[in-house]
A protein has these predicted regions:
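Non-catalytic, topology-defining segments of multipass membrane proteins
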Residues: 1-204
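Single conserved hydrophobic/aromatic residue that forms the stacking wall/gate
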Residues: 205-215
């Protein structure tokens, strides 16, 4: 039996930990928000924070990550490119290269061997269907995969601006946390408002996932 490369093993562990954090944070945020809403109610501040950040990141994912970076459905200058790259990254669905490479690979092998999030069951019967459903929705995020960027996104690798945005992925996530927190904190002039903005504008919203795009 061949031992796994320690570097690859550590990288896989970090990726799985990040995947759990990405999946668990909105789930926990939703529970906390619902409990607080039940006991304290919600106002226009919370609704505004949720709607604003959802629309911003959904635009970044739907138009940016999907139509622009993955499919080149239109052309854009550096300002628009940066806007879509940053807005899409704030959704915390992965850096530009990861998102586009995964989506292009999905289209190249749709529901076949090589599709990173195919729902086709590996086993027959009810259990196999459940496993396929789980893998298509969340399980694929925890699978250790060799990076395929040079095969599926060579055009993005040659773009200096896109590479700079991609390399600062975690900075954009932090920016997505700070924007609604600062805005709500300044509006209310209170730490409570800032925390409310953090919860409703960051930890609650979820944007459409790459697996949902079929075109």
């Amino acid at each position: 039996m061949t031992a796994m490369n320690p570097h690859i093993d550590r990288t896989g562990q970090r990726e799985r930990q990040l995947a759990w954090l990405t999946v668990a944070t909105p789930a926990v945020g939703t529970v906390v928000a619902l409990v607080l809403a039940w006991h304290q109610g919600i106002g226009w501040l919370e609704i505004g924070a949720l709607a604003s950040m959802y629309l911003l990141t959904a635009l970044g994912v739907e138009v940016g990550m999907h139509r622009f970076f993955s499919h080149h459905a239109f052309k854009a200058g550096p300002v628009i490119t940066a806007f879509f790259g940053i807005a899409g990254s704030m959704a915390a669905q992965g850096p530009i290269l990861f998102w586009a490479a995964t989506h292009r690979q999905h289209h190249a092998f749709t529901d076949k061997e090589g599709d990173p999030h195919s729902p086709r069951p590996l086993k027959a019967g009810f259990i196999g269907n459940i496993q396929g459903w789980w893998h298509a929705h969340l399980g694929w995020l925890f699978s250790l995969r060799k990076q395929n960027w040079s095969q599926f996104v060579p055009d993005l690798l040659r773009d200096r601006l896109i590479m700079q945005i991609n390399q600062r992925y975690y900075l954009w996530i932090i920016l997505g946390l700070l924007l609604p927190s600062l805005a709500c904190g300044l509006i209310t002039r209170s730490w409570e408002g800032a925390l409310s903005g953090l919860l409703w504008g960051c930890l609650l919203y979820t944007s459409p996932s790459p697996r949902d795009k079929r075109q």
